[in-house]
Regions:
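Catalytic alpha-helical scaffold of carbohydrate-active enzymes acting on polysaccharides/glycoconjugates
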Residues: 2-213, 239-266, 272-316
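A structural motif
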Residues: 206-226
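Binuclear metal-dependent hydrolase catalytic cores centered on His/Asp/Glu-rich metal-binding motifs
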Residues: 221-241
């Protein structure tokens, strides 16, 4: 199956359909579990960063206004993630020797070099989450392209490695094409519509067509819902939702049942899940999956490479 964005109707509502491929996860795993830690603190909308107004998204405030000057409370909420929350989350993974993928905004990482070094030393993957954590929907294409190049350059300088995964999040209709234009990305995660990776046919700006591996992300198994009206008010419902999702997918991967292993993504934010009253949801979930066998906890790059090896890029 290939998602063909070059067709007159560029959406694919069919996907793998009734017969998804067997993922063949390493060790015969029934599920691949993938944790993403979004590191955005210090790159959010702020007049200090040259933006028109203060941040409005994913904080402790309900429907905050965007001010054309510094918003001290909003800055403090974001600073909590960088000063305290991120370390609380990292400790949970370090004590369990589990890997994760960091969606790192380059300006944020640049403002916290000690943390960037810690990510690398702990063996976590850093995927590029753009230059600034802003909405690119109406940003001129040339500006978005320049931001992407600068973001990659910063990560290269700070880590000594080129980012192999891309996720903008607040993307634009141009983002996927620009990712293909740059090339060299083993996966793109700006997609939420499947439980398995898949190949997408993308037309580059020069008119050529290339396959791009998509490793889907999630907005439901995501602590961002602590900051949404219809979301979680405390740790218990978030833990229960993660547990229910895992249990359902684990059952689908049972060789004696559906025998259809999938992947489960979990999205985390330092300023949200890193709070003491919320971290217990993560702790309980990690304890829950540790009680099951045939569970592969992996970085996104590991999943991408596994998929590309088992299901090579199509030729066209």
């Amino acid at each position: 199956m290939i998602y063909d964005t070059t067709l007159p109707y560029p959406r694919d509502l069919i996907g793998y359909g009734q017969n998804p491929p067997h993922a063949q996860w390493p060790g015969g795993a029934r599920i691949a579990v993938q944790f993403v830690l979004n590191y955005e603190e210090g790159a959010e909308n702020a007049v200090l960063h040259g933006d028109a107004g203060s941040e409005q998204f994913l904080s402790e405030m309900f429907n905050p206004a965007s001010y054309p000057e510094r918003h001290m409370s909003m800055e403090g909420i974001y600073e909590y993630g960088a000063r305290a929350g991120v370390w609380r989350i990292l400790r949970e993974f370090e004590k369990r020797k589990l890997p994760l993928t960091v969606f790192g905004v380059s300006n944020a990482l640049q403002r916290h070099p000690d943390l960037t070094r810690a990510f690398v030393e702990l063996g976590h993957e850093i995927a590029c989450h753009g230059l600034k954590w802003i909405h690119y929907q109406h940003i001129p294409e040339a500006v978005e392209r320049a931001h992407m190049q600068e973001a990659m350059d910063i990560l290269q300088r700070m880590t000594g490695q080129r980012a192999l995964g891309w996720y903008t999040g607040r993307d634009s209709p141009n983002t996927r094409r620009l990712v293909a234009d740059f090339g060299g990305f083993e996966y793109d995660s700006d997609y939420y519509g499947d439980d398995l990776p898949f190949w997408m046919k993308v037309r580059k700006t020069d008119g050529s067509e290339v396959p791009q591996l998509i490793v889907p992300y999630t907005l439901d198994c995501n602590d961002m819902r602590f900051a949404l009206p219809q979301g979680y008010s405390h740790a218990d419902p978030f833990y229960q939702y993660l547990k229910d999702t895992f249990d359902a997918l684990y059952a689908e991967g049972d060789p004696a049942g559906d025998n259809a292993p999938k992947m489960m993504s979990i999205g985390m934010h330092c300023r949200l899940l890193g709070r003491p009253g919320r971290i217990t949801a993560l702790q309980r979930f990690l304890d829950h999956i540790a009680q099951r066998d045939k569970v592969w906890v992996a970085r996104r790059i590991d999943i991408a490479r596994h998929w590309a090896q088992r299901f090579p890029a199509p030729k066209f």
